[in-house]
UniProtKB/Swiss-Prot annotation:
PANTHER family: ELONGATION FACTOR P, ELONGATION FACTOR P (EF-P) FAMILY PROTEIN. GO terms for molecular function: translation elongation factor activity. It holds the Pfam family Elong-fact-P_C. It is found in: Cytoplasm. Keywords: Cytoplasm, Elongation factor, Protein biosynthesis. InterPro entries: Elong-fact-P_C (IPR015365), NA-bd_OB-fold (IPR012340), Rib_uL2_dom2 (IPR014722), Transl_elong_fac_P/YeiP (IPR020599), Transl_elong_KOW-like (IPR013185), Transl_elong_P/YeiP_cen (IPR001059), Transl_elong_P/YeiP_CS (IPR013852), Transl_elongation_fac_P (IPR011768). The keyword Cytoplasm applies. Pathway: Protein biosynthesis; polypeptide chain elongation. This is Elongation factor P. Involved in peptide bond synthesis. Stimulates efficient translation and peptide-bond synthesis on native or reconstituted 70S ribosomes in vitro. Probably functions indirectly by altering the affinity of the ribosome for aminoacyl-tRNA, thus increasing their reactivity as acceptors for peptidyl transferase. The gene is efp.
Amino acid sequence: MATTNDLKNGMVLNIDGQLWAVVEFQHVKPGKGPAFVRTKLKNVESNKTVDKTFNAGTKVETATVDRRTMQYLYNDGSSYVFMDVQSYDQLEIAPEIVGNAKNFLLENQEAIVATNEGRVLFIELPASVELEITFTEPGLAGDSATGRTKPATLETGHEIQVPLFINQGEKVKVDTRDSSYLGRVKG
């Protein structure tokens, strides 16, 4: 058991027998009335997102979540195969659970796999990853002054928007939460 004051992003709550991951939370102390916590929760099984408000200090039941570092091996067409880096056990994960993480997964890349009672809940990637641009229209000299963007395909096949001066073959840093371009990788 925890209270709403202990909430953190990524924490998993057991509400009415269903598991919900905390996506966002905000403690609100209005000028008049008691403080409360506004949250955005994502159902671990259905991926449905809801907004829920709790009174500050309300007790909530937390789910026991085991987070293990695993290495992504390959996609066999029907599932994504990960390997535990300590025990070398392999685990097949359904595409629905992998979700948007598939857009940033490269073979041999490490990720955190969260499980509850042996069931995979979700995959956590680092906040940003470095990926190579495999296709984009060529940039023109002097295109760095404007804030305009163009589509670019990453080595994973995912398409993002990049500034006009980025060229094919360059490595870029990408935010895994919203697919936004963060910068060019030096070296």
